[in-house]
Amino acid sequence: MRRITYPYSKIGIDNQARHRPMADVILIASNGESVRFEALADTGADFCLFPLNVAKLLGLRLDQLETATTTGVGNASNLTYCDDLTIDLGDGIIFTTRVGFTWGMDRAGFGLLGQQGFFENYNVEFRHRDRIFAIESA
Amino acid sequence: MAMNINEIHALMDGLPIGAWVAISTDQRRVLSYGEDALQVFAEAKKQGEKVPFIGRVPDPNELMFF
């Protein structure tokens, strides 16, 4: 069994601070290009989603990717480009899954680790009061 | 080895909110920052970083919902 424990990220100060379960991940495209990025463990996301700029950093050609529409708060329909990527969290926790890329995530500047590929394969323990979370492989 | 996101964010202190930033794998240096993610990434690669960390300077006043 492998287990990685992360501190929550802290944005802002004092009682205005936001604490988020963020992990750093390496995204590896089928062309061999890779980039390190931060991603929120988001149980509400159906699949893994990243900013569209990340697809460009990875050298993916948008005109060759499948498209889908995704829905989030404030946006009823987002054009989303999809490709199969390997996501490496380190310490042997690595998986390949379908990843979406959409402009809607560019403002956030981080990605989402969602149900498909991530939560369906790993046990994730949130200890919000302790400001830590852990990812554990079977 | 996982990077500590809070240490990465600490390196972003003082940079313009919303800027794209490249951080070295050893978490010690800001390699590049600016408005264009591709340019920031390219400049980091030029400095010899094979897999730089790329992120955006967070806005401490922004609430997010997904």
Predicted regions and their residues:
Chain A
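Pepsin/retropepsin-fold aspartyl endopeptidases
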Residues: M1-A138
